[in-house]
Amino acid sequence: MLTVDDVLEQVGEFGWFQKQTFLILCLLSAAFAPIYVGIVFLAFTPDHRCRSPGVAELSRRCGWSLAEELNYTVPGPGPESQCLRYEVDWNQSTLGCLDPLASLATNGSPLPLGPCEQGWVYDTPGSSIVTEFNLVCDDSWKVDLFQSCVNLGFFLGSLGVGYIADRFGRKVCLLATTLTCASLGVLTAVAPDYTSLLIFRLLQGLVSKGSWTAGYTLITEFVGLGYRRTVAILYQMAFTVGLVLLSGLAYILPHWRWLQLAVSLPIFLLLFRFWFVPESPRWLLSQKRNTEAIKIMDHIAQKNGKLPPADLKMLSLEEDVTEKLSPSFIDLFRTPNLRKYTFILMYLWFTSSVVYQGLIMHVGATGGNLYLDFLYSALVEFPAGFIILVTIDRFGRRYPLATSNLAAGLACFLMIFIPHDLPWLNIMVACVGRMGITIVFQMVCLVNAELFPTFIRNLGMMVCSSLCDLGGVLTPFLVFRLMEVWQGSPLILFAALGLVAGGMTLLLPETKGVTLPETIEDAENLQRKAKPKENKIYLQVQTSELNTQAAERDASQGTAQQK
C-alpha cells in the first residue's frame, strides 16, 4: 500500500520544495530567540545609585571624577550604595570639596540614610525596562515577574495552540499565531507602563511558542524519512543563529524599545511567505481529506521537477471508509505505551528547562561583558547540534539522549566539588553540562514528534513541552532560594534531575529508521521491534483487517477509541 514516505521517495524527500519551505521556517525559528531569552537585554540591570538633587552640581563645581563623586556622596559598598542615600541637602553652600560630609557628622555618629525618593542614576548609555520603570531595590522582583509572565504564557498556550494545530491544521495555526505574535511584539515596544508591558508579554507567550512548534511539526512532516532528523536539528540550530544575531543587534541598539521593534517588525514579512506554504499532507490524511493531500503531493512533485507515482490520482477515487481522527487530550493517556511516553517526555522537558536555565543563572552571575558572555554561551550550542548530526544515525535517538542527560547531571555534580580558586575549571565543566543539556533540548523535540501519531502529534508536542515552560517559571525561585541556603544546593538538584532523566530515557523505544506513526496502534507498536515497513502513514485507507479489529474492540469496550 502506497504511503507518504513512498511517494516522497519518488518525488523527492528533500527537493527544491522542501528546501525552500525549510529555509522560510528557519527564519521563524530564529525569530523566536528574542522572545525566549530577550529578557537578558530588555531587562538588564546596570550599576545604579540613588539620585540626590544637588550632587551633580557639586561634582561639577568641585571638579570630581566619577570615582570621587561616588566615594563622597554614596553610602558604602553593597545594597546600601544602590538602594539608600545620605539624607543630606547637597545644595547647601557650606559643603566643601574635600570630604564634604565630615562637617555634618556629629560626635562621629554615622549620617542617617533614607530611601531613594528621587529615583536612581544608572551607569549605562542605553536603556532597559529596569532603567525606564525603576525596577530595582524593593521593585527588583518585578523583573522576575516579567520573565515569569512569558513562561506562564508558554505554559498556558501549549494546551490551546497545540489543539488548534491538530484540529484545524498546521498552516492555520502558523498564520494565526505568527500574526498575533508580531503584533504583540510591537505593542510591547510601545507599552506606556509596566502593567501593560506584563499583559503584552503574557499574551505573546501564549502564541509565540505555538508558532515555533507549528513550524517544527510542519517541516518534519514535509520531508522524507531520511531527512527528518536532519531538518529537525537544523531547525533548532536556526534558533541558535537567532541568539547570535540577537547579541549583535542588542549591541547596535542598546535602547530596549528600539531593540524590541527591530526583532518584532521582520516577523510581519514572514507572513507573506507563510501564506504560500501548503498544509501538511500527513495532517490532511489524518482528517480524511485525501483529495487535498494528493493535490499537495502532486504540487511537491512539480516543484521538485519529478513525476508523481502513476497511481497517485487513483487513490482519490477510492471510497473513504475510515473514521476521521480528531485530537483529544485523553488520547495521550489512552493506552499503556502512550501513557508512558507522555509522562517520560514531560519529565525530560521539565528537566531540560530547569538544568538549561539554571546553569545559565548559576554560572552567568559573574559580572562580565553582557554581549560577549551571551555570544559565547550561544556559540556553545553549535557543537551540540553537530554532535547530534554525527551520532544520531549511528547510535539512534535513545542512547545519545540518555548519555547527554547523564553528562549534564554528572557535570553539575562535579561542579559542587570544584574549589572557588579554580574558576577556569568550573567554567569548563559548566560548558560540558551546558552542551549536554543543549543536546537534550534538541533531541527531545525530535523524539517527541516521532513517538505520537499524526492526529495528536502537535498536541503531544505542546502538552509535553508545557512542562518546559513550567520549569522556566520555577527555575529562578529554585536557584536563588537554594543559593541562600548554600551556593552548591542548586547543583545538587540539577545533578539529580539529569541523572534520573538519563535512566528514564532508556525506557523509551528507539525510533531510528521508523516511519511516523499514524494511529494509536502504530504508536503502541513502536515498543516492539517492528519491520521497517510495519508502521506507515497511509495515503488512502487502512486495511479492512485493522477496521475489523477496531470494530470488534469498540464493540467490546462499548465506546469508540477515537473520534
From Swiss-Prot:
Residues 1-21, 166-171, 220-232, 279-342, 393-398, 447-459, 509-563 are cytoplasmic. The keyword Electron transport does not apply. Residues 43-144, 193-196, 254-257, 364-371, 419-423, 481-487 are extracellular. It is found in: Basolateral cell membrane; Apical cell membrane; Lateral cell membrane; Basal cell membrane. Phosphorylated. GO terms for molecular function: (R)-carnitine transmembrane transporter activity; acetylcholine transmembrane transporter activity; monoamine transmembrane transporter activity; neurotransmitter transmembrane transporter activity; organic anion transmembrane transporter activity; organic cation transmembrane transporter activity; prostaglandin transmembrane transporter activity; putrescine transmembrane transporter activity. The modification Phosphoserine is found at S328. Glycans are attached at N71. Gene3D superfamilies: MFS general substrate transporter like domains. A motif (Proline-rich sequence) lies at residues 278-282. Keywords: Cell membrane, Glycoprotein, Ion transport, Membrane, Phosphoprotein, Transmembrane, Transmembrane helix, Transport. Phosphorylation of the transporter leads to changes in its substrate affinity, resulting in a regulation of the transport activity. In contrast with rat ortholog, ASP uptake is inhibited by protein kinase A (PKA) and C (PKC) activation. ASP uptake is also endogenously activated by calmodulin, the calmodulin-dependent kinase II and LCK tyrosine kinase. Inhibited by cGMP, most likely through a cGMP-binding protein that interacts with OCT1. It catalyses: 1-methylnicotinamide(out) = 1-methylnicotinamide(in); dopamine(out) = dopamine(in); serotonin(out) = serotonin(in); (R)-adrenaline(out) = (R)-adrenaline(in). NCBIfam families: 2A0119. Involved in the uptake of clinically used drugs including diabete treatment medicine metformin, neurotoxins 1-methyl-4-phenylpyridinium (MPP(+)) and iobenguane and platinum-based drug cisplatin. Also involved in metformin efflux transport. Metformin competitively inhibits OCT1-mediated thiamine uptake, leading to a decrease in hepatic steatosis. Plays a role in the anticancer activity of cisplatin and may contribute to antitumor specificity. Electrogenic voltage-dependent transporter that mediates the transport of a variety of organic cations such as endogenous bioactive amines, cationic drugs and xenobiotics. Functions as a pH- and Na(+)-independent, bidirectional transporter. Cation cellular uptake or release is driven by the electrochemical potential (i.e. membrane potential and concentration gradient) and substrate selectivity. Hydrophobicity is a major requirement for recognition in polyvalent substrates and inhibitors. This is Solute carrier family 22 member 1. It comes from Bos taurus.
